[in-house]
């Protein structure tokens, strides 16, 4: 996937060294945008193996409104484990496994009094607006609540996404991400929001269009530089295709979106180079 290689090279060629909250240090740059035409293939990195099932299960967990890392782990995904132990959650008076008002809560109960589900269901509102007012320029979901940003160990990195319905039939999505771990996080983020666009298009009976990816601070952790160079030495492979398995067209509207499971998505023809392991900066 050339766009991903371009992103990494942009940091290496133009970035500067920065200190960061983890103490690891980064090579960081600010401001990047790229575009993926979802009709030409599903954007997933091919120069290392990306566990697509983890991408999908995490997204379904977000959409459900759940914030329990224990429940995500039950789906076979442990990528939030570093922020879910008692050492991290006790700082906020929460038990181990309770991540607090992270993505799922903010998407489904924005402005609420955590853990009460008394906020705005942005996903429900989004689907309603796509159906009733597709020309709206307000098809927006935000994950950044200043009241809650200090109430979690890891406030949202991917902070706002907007949809546009073109000509009444094609759905585009743009994501703004305030902070992007280029080696570990970005491959997940690209595929997650591409999948979200496919799902939203399917349940609203639209076609997929473009996914536009806009970054604020995008960075390579210093202990990932060897892995980045290894990845860049590899040649990108052709992109796979994504199909939604819904032959009876049962997945419609909010209920359909929330009923979607990994078994409903089929990534066809994903070929990749081997896995490249790297430590998570906590």
What is the meaning of each model-derived region?
Residues 1-282:
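Terminal, non-catalytic protein-protein interaction segments that mediate quaternary/complex assembly
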């Amino acid at each position: 996937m050339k766009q991903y290689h371009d992103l990494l090279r942009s940091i290496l060629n133009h970035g500067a060294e920065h200190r960061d909250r983890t103490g690891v240090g980064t090579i960081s740059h600010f401001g990047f945008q790229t575009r993926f035409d979802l009709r030409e293939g599903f954007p997933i990195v091919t120069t290392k193996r990306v566990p697509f099932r983890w991408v999908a299960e995490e997204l379904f967990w977000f959409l459900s409104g759940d914030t329990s890392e224990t429940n995500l782990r039950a789906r076979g995904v442990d990528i939030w484990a570093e922020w879910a132990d008692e050492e991290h959650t006790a700082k906020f008076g929460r038990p181990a496994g309770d991540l607090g008002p992270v993505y799922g809560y903010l998407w489904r109960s924005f402005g609420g009094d955590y853990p009460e589900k008394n906020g705005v269901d942005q996903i429900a509102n989004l689907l309603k607006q796509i159906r009733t007012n597709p020309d709206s320029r307000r098809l927006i979901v935000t994950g950044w609540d200043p009241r809650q940003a200090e109430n979690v160990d890891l406030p949202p990195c991917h902070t706002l996404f907007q949809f546009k319905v073109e000509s009444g039939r094609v759905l585009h999505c743009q994501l703004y991400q305030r902070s992007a771990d280029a080696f570990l996080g970005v491959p997940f983020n690209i595929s997650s929001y591409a999948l979200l666009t496919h799902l939203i298009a399917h349940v609203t009976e639209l076609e997929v269009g473009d996914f536009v990816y806009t970054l604020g601070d995008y960075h390579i952790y210093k202990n990932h530089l060897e892995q980045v160079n290894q990845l860049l030495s590899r040649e990108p492979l052709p992109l796979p295709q994504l199909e939604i398995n819904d032959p009876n067209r049962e997945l419609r509207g909010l209920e359909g979106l929330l009923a979607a499971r990994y078994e409903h998505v089929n990534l066809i023809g994903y070929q990749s180079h081997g896995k490249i392991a790297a430590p998570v900066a906590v």
